[in-house]
Regions:
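Catalytic cores of RNA-modifying enzymes
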Residues: 1-209, 256-264
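An accessory alpha-helical subdomain
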Residues: 187-195, 199-234, 239-254, 258-259
Length: 264
């Protein structure tokens, strides 16, 4: 099993580098917890893995019989994976997951990854815009709160709205800081999301952009934030939303209804 401290240290010595803090490299060394998460995943035939590192998750995913496209930014780790984890169902791509064209992988597909903490939000947004069948991510616990945040909460934002409208989300497992090398000094959780059967027919990218616009001045009134829309007053009236309502208090379903009527 690759998710252990001995394998990780040996791999680092082999490629002659130290974990890159700038790339958010913290390697999971708790194989038991990781395997438990993978066993509970509902995966499509094609899986995109973000940041495979030394292949701890990759190995477990391949054991599930899926085809894996692994996107890794670190060239040394790409070489390591190609040398040590050759498999007919694995393609390792050297690239930036933020710039990767998720639509280039045949649908339906799932996305799995141990996400770099410093780009968790933009990376999750990029993935959700591609609307995978399922999305499983190891993230900092504080970042995970954004998926589940409710209106009026400080962490409530576009990521909360899109997650709750398009996915059924849950925490699969908690990972204390000692589950990683080097120790990140923060607790992490593995979050699982499966696409809802009643997910909106609106493109997630469009709704994400609208929610971002709406919440850019979260303490302002909804009328102020919609001043670019000439039909805003009629739409607010139709939805019985008082114009003095603050955007941060609106439920995801209300924001979806606003989008649909404003763009009708």
């Amino acid at each position: 099993m690759r998710a252990d401290i001995a394998f990780t240290k040996t791999a680092l010595e082999r490629i002659g580098v130290k974990p890159n803090k700038a790339l958010g490299q913290n390697f999971c060394i708790d194989g038991k917890r990781l395997a438990s998460c993978v066993e509970r995943m509902t995966l499509a035939e094609n899986v995109i893995e973000i940041g495979p590192g030394f292949g701890a998750l990759t190995e477990l995913l391949l054991e599930r019989g899926v085809t894996v496209t692994a996107v890794e930014k670190d060239e040394a780790m790409v070489r390591f994976l190609n040398e040590t984890l050759s498999h007919p169902n694995l393609a390792v791509i050297c690239g930036d997951a933020l710039k990767f064209r998720y639509g280039s992988v045949p649908a339906p597909f799932s996305v799995v990854g141990n996400l770099p903490y410093y780009i968790t939000t933009p990376l999750c947004a990029a993935v959700q815009k591609a609307l995978p069948e399922s999305f499983y991510a190891m993230v900092q616990k504080e970042a995970a709160d954004r998926f589940f945040a409710k209106p009026k909460e400080a962490s409530y934002g576009p990521l909360s709205i899109v997650t709750q409208l398009y996915y059924d989300a849950a925490v699969l497992e908690s990972f204390p800081e000692e589950c990683f090398y080097p120790n990140p000094k923060v607790a992490s959780v593995f979050v699982g999301m499966t696409r809802r059967p009643d997910a909106p027919d609106v493109a997630p990218a469009k709704l994400f952009a609208f929610a971002t616009e709406l919440l850019s001045m979260r303490r302002k009134t909804i009328r102020n934030n919609l001043k670019a829309y000439p039909n805003a007053d009629d739409v607010l009236n139709a939805l019985s939303v008082p114009p003095e309502t603050r955007a941060e208090t609106l439920a995801p379903e209300t924001i979806l209804a606003l989008y649909r009527l404003l763009h009708a």
